[in-house]
C-alpha cells in the first residue's frame, strides 16, 4: 500500500500512475491482494498483463478471512480489483493454472511478478519465539484455514497459540467455539 507506507515521499504516488516505458508483457503469478493490486497497477500503466492463479477463484487468503464473522467487508479488497481487472482489455486471467518454474520460462516474458502468498508455520516459531516448540510432532497441528475447514475432525479441546497477537486468532477461536469446539487460547 504505497499511501500507507509513505512511498509518496519518494515520488511514488498510487494515484499518479506513470505510463509504460516498454512494450514488454508482464506475468503475475498469484491473485491474492498483492497479485491483484500488481495486475491492476501494471494494466493502468498500459502493459499487457497475464494473471495466473492456481485456484479456481481470484482473491487468495482474503477469500478465507472474509468468510469469518466480522470480516466480510474485507472481500471488497478482492471485489474492487477483480471488477477492474475484468473490465480491462489488456489483462488475461487464467484460473486453475498452477505454474512451475519451467512453465514460467516457457511463457517468454521478461517481467515476472511472484505474488504466491505465504504459509502458516506449524512449529511454534513466531514473533516472540525463535525455536520450535518441542513435542508438536506428536500432536495434530492446524493452520487457521485447516482448523476452520476441518473443525469436524477436531476431538477434544483445541489450543490456539497466538504469537502474532493480531485479529485472526481471536476470530478463529470465536468461529470454532460457535461450532461447539472447546478452545484454549494461549498468548506468549
Short names for language-model regions:
Residues 1-5, 85, 111:
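C-terminal catalytic ATP-binding subdomain
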Residues 1-4, 33, 69:
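Proline-rich low-complexity regions
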Residues 6, 60, 64, 70, ...:
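Generic structural "secondary-structure junction" signal
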Residues 20-54, 58, 94-105, 115-129, ...:
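Rossmann-like dinucleotide/flavin-binding elements
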Residues 60-110, 126, 188:
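N-terminal Rossmann-like dinucleotide/flavin-binding domain of flavoprotein oxidoreductases
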